[in-house]
From Swiss-Prot:
InterPro entries reported in the protein's UniProt record: Ribosomal_bS21, Ribosomal_bS21_CS, Ribosomal_bS21_sf
Protein name: Small ribosomal subunit protein bS21
Pfam families per record: Ribosomal_S21
GO cellular component, one term: ribonucleoprotein complex
BP GO terms, sorted: translation
Amino acid sequence: MPHVRVKENEPFEVALRRFKRTCEKAGVLTEVRRREFYEKPTEIRKRKAAAAVKRQAKRVSKEVARRERLY
């Protein structure tokens, strides 16, 4: 859990904004949303496999675009 020390004479809104930013960088909200409901192990594997396919397709499309620019 990220924590932020409030500096002297620092407005509450500024400290809250810094805390929100650190939570965003740490991925707290995405983790909470992901763990909100139970996910079956098969669903986890399917999600990871789909993400891997998506990454591979993105990598291939970037490679093809790079090759086209070279000629």
